[in-house]
């Protein structure tokens, strides 16, 4: 064989050292970024398979290349498992990302310049829900809905009133930083009232939906988009679902040839593994634990007057905290916690007054620590460690104590046990 570099450790020491450093970071950091999780070794093995060698433009049994009989099996497995997992009639597992899935949904349902009603970024929406710096805001006329100023929860009556005034061609439901259950049936009612399509982006809550712990949007939305990582605990990638045959043809055409060429069949194989894992009853136990851990952690902040828990609580895998009583902004909080090996992100809060590069809040998610096996006791401990670090951010000796406690926790719950 022409290759003499079968072991990348020996062939590319510089790259190997960087990957080893990242593995060490993941092993010894408490990961609280709500959009991140830890995949199984089986998912990683599938993604590292020989399927990376195969080009397969098109769809199973309708390819533009030969030699696709086995990748057809792989992709068909992923499709059928996704359909079963979410109760959908049609699934497309080819999107490279959630953003690609959202772009395809827009292409399938509306035209450039059409009016779309989506969740405002500061209220908890996503860049692809109409941010002016994103393709969505540049291509379509997005109008943002927000949350109630008092409750910081979605106000469906207000959204209906806004929809009647705006008359959108499409309504987008779903969020990247909203800690409450979303009523997709209500959103479909609103869409029907104004003759609009409904698209649901369930990227953050897909694992909870799969486990039956959040209302399933598939019966209500014309198209559902998702990522396959986050709470679903699969590889980084996207997913499209629908119950409408005509729309399924449009969304498939939007992905290929509209947005993408050859699908990443090695990633699709990893998606198939993740879907099988999510169909296992043990995954429901995992999702329940995620919700319990998040609630336990949020409760600690709710009881501390120095912090403000956005919307007063959480129903899912994440929550937001206003930290400005103890530290200047979310950016500084994120950087400080990085120093003690707790990883999370700064985040705008509803009706934000600071720059999006600074923010008043932080976003905390518990999917990854739950994958490590941590429970409600550890979740409360982590919350207290975060508070201890933020309140004492100018006291190096206390920060060192926090760093030590973080290491004790991560050592007790290893990420990938060494063989």
Curated annotation (Swiss-Prot):
It holds the Pfam family SHMT. (6S)-5,6,7,8-tetrahydrofolate binds at residues 121, 125-127, 355-357. Its cofactor is pyridoxal 5'-phosphate. Keywords: Amino-acid biosynthesis, Cytoplasm, One-carbon metabolism, Pyridoxal phosphate, Transferase. The keyword Ribosomal protein does not apply. Its main location: cytoplasm. It is found in: Cytoplasm. One of its GO terms (cellular component) is cytosol. The modification N6-(pyridoxal phosphate)lysine is found at residue 230. Transmembrane segments: none annotated. InterPro entries: PyrdxlP-dep_Trfase, PyrdxlP-dep_Trfase_major, PyrdxlP-dep_Trfase_small, Ser_HO-MeTrfase, Ser_HO-MeTrfase-like, Ser_HO-MeTrfase_PLP_BS, SHMT-like_dom. The record marks 229 as: Plays an important role in substrate specificity. It catalyses: (6R)-5,10-methylene-5,6,7,8-tetrahydrofolate + glycine + H2O = (6S)-5,6,7,8-tetrahydrofolate + L-serine. Its EC number is 2.1.2.1. Homodimer. Catalyzes the reversible interconversion of serine and glycine with tetrahydrofolate (THF) serving as the one-carbon carrier. This reaction serves as the major source of one-carbon groups required for the biosynthesis of purines, thymidylate, methionine, and other important biomolecules. Also exhibits THF-independent aldolase activity toward beta-hydroxyamino acids, producing glycine and aldehydes, via a retro-aldol mechanism. This is Serine hydroxymethyltransferase. It comes from Streptococcus equi subsp. equi (strain 4047). The gene is glyA.
